[in-house]
Structures are given as structure tokens and as C-alpha cells.
């Protein structure tokens, strides 16, 4: 299996992008430690608890937690919980579970931006006292008009020159709950003519009469992200505040707050390119829409781009970590091909997944010349290379093969079973198809075959049998359900639609096929949830985390054996 790279994997990175280090942050951190600027490093991962983590977050997790671990530092998990109307404890629990599942531990207790609400409020008051913040009564529509655009400077709010005393009074009344949601905001007084739109008197506080999952009903004013981010970093002693490139334009504002407040430290913000993966959606709003409108079963549906979805589908933490390392950390935006992620999981499972046989579309085979009542216990390796021991398959007169492995009128080059043709059963004997039994509608319901008793573990004398197919014994095999998952979207860019269209128009109608009545070899009867296997000739599968039970297994296809989508 050849390893795709940014050069030979389709769309792995932006075409023409210059060569960059695997992680441009490593030499920066090393230099800071060598110079004594920092004695140790502290990073943070600050998700907003308004949805489940997706594959894009995996890169941020691996960067922040990975660098901290590599350099002997710590990484904080801090929830940016400044918008109570959209946040939920369910998301907080899921995020913690996902970070741990990926193999990382945060330093100390879980932290919340809401832990610092009192301090942030005091700093907002400090900005008012310094004449650098004011209460504004403009409506959202008016504020948008006053803000200007990239070509035109903004205009000062008519409330910009309120006195310090009036601003302190109004802000105190905002905090006391005297005003309705949206009636007033607190804004920083910076520069309405700045070419950087983020510096045009940004909002610091909004009024939201909403119950907060951590602070209850203590607050009815909440700080926005930009006012919370840098100061929280300063409080926690973050040395390297690492975020994605869309926040590059926010860095001057990040620094402005730290420069104008009596903070205990002045962290430095660094930006790297976010993970853009084709055939996926990572907008939390759109992921939530998929769930709410029941296009998928839940946030952890194995077709979703959420980490819980990838986990349930059978992806391993190592495969996702290795994928994030493979694509590198740089400042060059591009689109990574899904085939790179699929390569990573195939590479991992090829080495770690035990082999097993499962017949997805069973066709009964009766070996007419095999002694009735006789059973042989055949030993097959659990892995062709790794020492995983053996599993035992009972071989007797009746067994199942896949319906797709027999054709009455096969095309040229067909190497499976056909009338009067021979094929080897994996790890067993060579059989010949003698007769196809059909029902009243002409459907094949059973094959009558004969076997060559001298072909166990060796080729028959004087003839070459090319085809090898998988099978399971009729007696002892376990009935199971198999879910064949594929990419949720049929377009590399699901966001690209016809005028007036929706990303939902690009949903792949063949993203899930549920097969019942499948037959698995006896060793799979006691498969535990999340046990992973290579079903020989079929793909990589795992026992479903929610629905699979010993004796009644449900298997999800993680990925096919080869890329079926092409380059």
C-alpha cells in the first residue's frame, strides 16, 4: 500500500503551495524555550459547547495537545461558554469524551470561560474608566450601517462620546437586568476608520436573559468571543495561543485588549491552516441541521464528520492522529482529499485488525460428496503477518458463500464459481459447482457442489485453481446485521450547488445500505462493541458501539479494502 502525500494524493494541498515544515510551530516553540522566554509551554483547546467536535477539531486537538506533550508542557481544555442560548451539557460531555478518546489528557481541571466572568466584567469596567469602552444604543441594523465595509470607513456611533460616568451607570444597569435583549451593547472605543474591520469598535458585551449551564441566572450580560479569548489565555498563563487562520485578522484585537488591561501575562497568538476535507461538511450549524431534519440518525451517525461519528464507524484514534500528522501544520490553506484519511485508517487496520469471514448475501452450498455427520476443525490465522494466533472454523457438508461469488453466465476473466468450475474456499478445500437449485421464480436458492479431499492446504494435481472465495459454515455461523456505510455526500464540495440549491441536494442516496440475515464465522458471535475486523474480501468493519450485542452482532463498514471513489 503506497502512502499518499501532499504531492501524490489528489487535492491533498493547495496546488503550487511551497514546501513547508511538517509543523512550523515546532521551531518557534523550541526557540522560545532555548532563549528562556518561557521555561515551559502551556497551550489550550477552547471549543464552544454548541455541538459535537468534528474532524476539523481533531487537527486543533492534535496540534495543541500534541505540541504540549512533545515539549513537556500542558494543554488546557477550556470551554468558550459565552453563548448560553446555544450551549448544552450534552456537548460538554461529548467533547471531553472525544478528547480522551483521541488519546489526550488536559492539564488540571476542565476550565470554562465562565469561570472568569467576574474578572472579565471588572476589566470591562476598567476599560470604561479609561475612556476606552462605551455603551451603545444602536440597533443591529444601524450598527451594521455605521460599521462601513472593506472599501468604506465606518462612522462613529452617536453614543461614542458618552461620559465615563454615564457609561458606568448604563453598564451597571445592563448587568442588573434593566434592559431587554439587544437593547444596548458595550463596545470598545478603537478606530471606526481602521482597515481591519475587527477594530471598528467591536462589541464586548451583549444582553442575553438566558439561563447558563454553569452560572445559572447570575448573569444577563455575556462577553463576546474576542473579549473573552485573550484575557482567558492571560489568566491561565497560556504561552502559545494557537488557532486557525480565520482568526488572523482578530490578532490585533487580541493584542489591543491585552495591551490596554492590567493582565497578568501577554500571550502570543499563532494561526495555522484549518483542515478542509472534501466530501464533508464541518459547519456545526449544518451538522445540526442534518440531525434535526433526520437526514442522519444522530450526531454520532457513522456518516457524520463528527469524531463520535468516525469512532462509531470504526476509525481508530491512532488513524486520526496519524492523518493529522501526515497533512502537517502550516499556514497554507488547501483541501485535503478524503482518500488520505481513508488511507490512514486502512494502514492502521491492515496491521491491527484480525481477519474474519462474513458472508453478506448468503447462498447455501451443499457438498454432496462430503461425508454426512463429519466435521473438521480448520485452523485459520487471525492475521497473515502479525502473531495473533488462530481461529477455528468447523467445516462440514453445508456452508454459505456469497451470492455474488456464483454466476451461471460469467464474463471473461471471472475467477469465482461458475457451472462446472472450480474455486478454493479460503483456508479450506477446492470445490466444483455441479448444480444450481432454483425456486419457482428461477432464483438460485442452493448450490450442489463436490469437493476434492486432496486439496486442503495444497493445489490439486495437474490443474490450477485461480479463484479463492470466502465462506462460513452453515452450522455454528452467527446471523448478523451489516451496515454498509459510504460517504454522506456525493460531491467533493457539498457546499457548491446550483443557484437556489442547498448542500442537502448533494447527499449521497447510497450512503447507507443495511443488510440483514448476513452470516459471520463463529468467532464473531462474541464480538464486543468497537471490536474491529477485516472481513476478508469485503473491507474493514467494527461492531457497532450502540446496537451490537454478543450473540446479536451489528457490524459497520469502516472503509472498503481499496479506494472505490477513484482519484
Curated annotation (Swiss-Prot):
Q: Which Gene3D superfamilies match?
A: Glutamyl-trna Synthetase, Domain 2, Glutamyl-tRNA Synthetase, Domain 3, HUPs, Ribosomal Protein L25, Chain P
Q: Which organism is it from?
A: Pseudomonas putida (strain ATCC 47054 / DSM 6125 / CFBP 8728 / NCIMB 11950 / KT2440)
Q: Which reaction does it catalyse?
A: tRNA(Gln) + L-glutamine + ATP = L-glutaminyl-tRNA(Gln) + AMP + diphosphate
Q: Which residues form a coiled coil?
A: none
This chain belongs to the protein called Glutamine--tRNA ligase
Where does the record place it? Cytoplasm
Q: Which domain of life is it from?
A: Bacteria
Where, by residue number, is the motif 'HIGH' region? 47-57
Per the annotation, the residue ranges of the short sequence motif 'KMSKS' region are 281-285
Which family does the similarity line name? Answer: Belongs to the class-I aminoacyl-tRNA synthetase family.
Keywords for the protein's UniProt record, in alphabetical order:
Aminoacyl-tRNA synthetase, ATP-binding, Cytoplasm, Ligase, Nucleotide-binding, Protein biosynthesis
Assembly notes: Monomer.
Amino acid at each position: 500500500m503506497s502512502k499518499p502525500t501532499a504531492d501524490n494524493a489528489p487535492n491533498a494541498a493547495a496546488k503550487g503551495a511551497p514546501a513547508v515544515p511538517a509543523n512550523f510551530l515546532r521551531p518557534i516553540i523550541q526557540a522560545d524555550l532555548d532563549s528562556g522566554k518561557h521555561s515551559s509551554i502551556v497551550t489550550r483547546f477552547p471549543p464552544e459547547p454548541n455541538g459535537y467536535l468534528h474532524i476539523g477539531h481533531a487537527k486543533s486537538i492534535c496540534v495543541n495537545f500534541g505540541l504540549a506533550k512533545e515539549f513537556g508542557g500542558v494543554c488546557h481544555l477550556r470551554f468558550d461558554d459565552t453563548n448560553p442560548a446555544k450551549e448544552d451539557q450534552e456537548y460538554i460531555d461529548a467533547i471531553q469524551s472525544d478528547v480522551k478518546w483521541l488519546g489526550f489528557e488536559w492539564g488540571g481541571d476542565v476550565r470554562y470561560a465562565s469561570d472568569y466572568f467576574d474578572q472579565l466584567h471588572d476589566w470591562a469596567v476598567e476599560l470604561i474608566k479609561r475612556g476606552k469602552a462605551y455603551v451603545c444604543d444602536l440597533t443591529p441594523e444601524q450598527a451594521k450601517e455605521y460599521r462601513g465595509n472593506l472599501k468604506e470607513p465606518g462612522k462613529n456611533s452617536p453614543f461614542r462620546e458618552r461620559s465615563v460616568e454615564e457609561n458606568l451607570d448604563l453598564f451597571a444597569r445592563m448587568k442588573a437586568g434593566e434592559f431587554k435583549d439587544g437593547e444596548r451593547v458595550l463596545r470598545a472605543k478603537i478606530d471606526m476608520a481602521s482597515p481591519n474591520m475587527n477594530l471598528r469598535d467591536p462589541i464586548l458585551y451583549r444582553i442575553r436573559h438566558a439561563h447558563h449551564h454553569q452560572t445559572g441566572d447570575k448573569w444577563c450580560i455575556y462577553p463576546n468571543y474576542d473579549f473573552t479569548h485573550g484575557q482567558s489565555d492571560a489568566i491561565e498563563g497560556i504561552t502559545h495561543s494557537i488557532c486557525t487562520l480565520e482568526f488572523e485578522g482578530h490578532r490585533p484585537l487580541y493584542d489591543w485588549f491585552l495591551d490596554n488591561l492590567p493582565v497578568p501575562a501577554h500571550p502570543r497568538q499563532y494561526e495555522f491552516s484549518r483542515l478542509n476535507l472534501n466530501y464533508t461538511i464541518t459547519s456545526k450549524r449544518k451538522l445540526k441541521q442534518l440531525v434535526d431534519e433526520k437526514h442522519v440518525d444522530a450526531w454520532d451517525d457513522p456518516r457524520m464528520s463528527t469524531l463520535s461519528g468516525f469512532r462509531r464507524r470504526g476509525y481508530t484514534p491512532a488513524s486520526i492522529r496519524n492523518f493529522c500528522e501526515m497533512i502537517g501544520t502550516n499556514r497554507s490553506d488547501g483541501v485535503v482529499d478524503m482518500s488520505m484519511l481513508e488511507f490512514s485508517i486502512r494502514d492502521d487496520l491492515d496491521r491491527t485488525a484480525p481477519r474474519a469471514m462474513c458472508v453478506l448475501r448468503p447462498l447455501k452450498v451443499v457438498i454432496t460428496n462430503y461425508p454426512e455427520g463429519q466435521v473438521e476443525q480448520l485452523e485459520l490465522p487471525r492475521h497473515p503477518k502479525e502473531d495473533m494466533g488462530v481461529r477455528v472454523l468447523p467445516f462440514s457438508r453445508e456452508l454459505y458463500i456469497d451470492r455474488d461469488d456464483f454466476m451461471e453466465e460469467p464474463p471473461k476473466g471471472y475467477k469465482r464459481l461458475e457451472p462446472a468450475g472450480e474455486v478454493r474456499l479460503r483456508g479450506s478445500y477446492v470445490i466444483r459447482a455441479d448444480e444450481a437449485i432454483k425456486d419457482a421464480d428461477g432464483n438460485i436458492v442452493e448450490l450442489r457442489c463436490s469437493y476434492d479431499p486432496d486439496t486442503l492446504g495444497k493445489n490439486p494435481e495437474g490443474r490450477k485453481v485461480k479463484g479463492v472465495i470466502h465462506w462460513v459454515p452453515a452450522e455454528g455461523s452467527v446471523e448478523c446485521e451489516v451496515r454498509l456505510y459510504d460517504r454522506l455526500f456525493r460531491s467533493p464540495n457539498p457546499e457548491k450547488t446550483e443557484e437556489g440549491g442547498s448542500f442537502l441536494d448533494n447527499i449521497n442516496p447510497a450512503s447507507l445500505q443495511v443488510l440483514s440475515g448476513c452470516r459471520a464465522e463463529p468467532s464473531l458471535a462474541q464480538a464486543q462493541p468497537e471490536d474491529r475486523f477485516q472481513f476478508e474480501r469485503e473491507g474493514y468493519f467494527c461492531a457497532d458501539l450502540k446496537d451490537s450485542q454478543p450473540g446479536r452482532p451489528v457490524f459497520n463498514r469502516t472503509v472498503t479494502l481499496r479506494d472505490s471513489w477513484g482519484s
